Each structure stands twice: as structure tokens, then as C-alpha cells.
Amino acid sequence: MIRQTTFHLSAKRRGCHLVTQEIFEHLPRPLPQVGMLNLFVQHTSCSLSINENYDPDVRTDMEAILNHMVKEREPYYEHTMEGSDDMPAHAKCSLFGVSLTIPITDGRLNMGTWQGIYLCEFRNHGGSRKIVATIYE
């Protein structure tokens, strides 16, 4: 059996945001005993990621690393009409990707103790983000 739902995550400022609980609240119940959850964000300037959920410094450090890797206002950018943060956001999105697949075991997301789901928002003002969640049983 396959179930699917679409929902919006609330708008976030630029940065890496722990959204595990916000996503979990939107998932249809009950989750299967064994299955897979695929999450897909329908945007090109943000990404989904799994990272450490305990120390908030990880979020700050990830933002700093990404900004160091992909800088704004580079003279070779041609796609600039949507602002100086837009082309770097597309590049960062391509590095991280727009989907995650998480195993479901015993009716729960089977993630490690220190793992959480992140929305990495690469725009200064990205707005709400549309997520498609597909559960495979």
C-alpha cells in the first residue's frame, strides 16, 4: 500500500532548521510496521537533510560551511534577477538534494538517536515550503 500527503512547512529564515517534529505531525497515522518514508520538497532553493539533532551549533556551523563553499555576488553568476541569494541557493540545493528516504520500523521512523530532519533554507526570505510525503508499506 502507498499513501501520500502534501503539506507546508512554516516559513523559516535562512539557515538549517530542525523540522523532525513539524514533519512528523503531518504524517498520516498509523505508520506501517515496516516501510519507507520518502520526503520531497517542491522547491529549488532549499533542501532536506539529516544531521545531528542535539547540538544547535551544528546548524550554525552548517550554514557557515555552506556560505563558505558557495558565495554570494560572484562575478560569474548570470542568474541574478531574483537577488544575490538566489543563484547560491540553487547551487546549495543541488549539493544537498530535495528528497530523503527514511526507513519505518515497528511503526516509527527508524533514525539514529542523534539524527533529525532538517530543512536547509538557502534564501533570506524563502517562504513556506511544500513537502510531499509518500509512505510505502
Located regions from the model:
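Active-site histidine-anchored catalytic micro-motif
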Residues: M1-E137
